[in-house]
Amino acid sequence: MTVMSDTDALEGLEPTETIDVKKVFGLDTKMKVKGFKTGTEYVPEIDEAYRFDPQTTLAILAGFEHNRRVMVQGYHGTGKSTHIEQIAARLNWPMIRVNLDSHVSRIDMVGKDAIVLKEGVQVTEFREGILPWALQRPVAIVFDEYDAGRPDVMFVIQRVLEASGKLTLLDQNRVIAPNPSFRLFATTNTVGLGDTTGL
């Protein structure tokens, strides 16, 4: 497991490498996308045996290349998150996955005040949550089980789905603009409408 840290191996990284989609993903297309020259601890491992669904792959690649929010829908266990992960691995794109189960709260997403020791003295300091941390870095964040997210969490995510993608931290009187290489993806089973079985 990779731990998010304040010491930043991601600082200054940009996707500068041109990647030939036909060569890397085996798809019949002339599409080229940008990726990172080298990987970091946040880049998923490549599964050489993974086979890409062409239509889904092109949609995800468009999300990476053109900074578009992409939601992948499908049944449980069909590899939605793995699909995004394996594309990120081949682009050397740092990625984190967040499962939006009932245990993920607004505080986890935004951050909270914490008591820390500084020079032997206890002080209160704001600790960024998952979303501000990722938003400021060249990271692809994947929200798994998007349709299962709690309402308070979904309101936080809603703001970064918009065109400018800025996140306002009211408690900190701060507005965070996204890193140019920040990307957002989601996976879902139902798209909020139930599925073909009526569940």
Residue ranges and their predicted role:
Residues 2-199:
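AAA+ P-loop NTPase catalytic core and its hallmark functional loops
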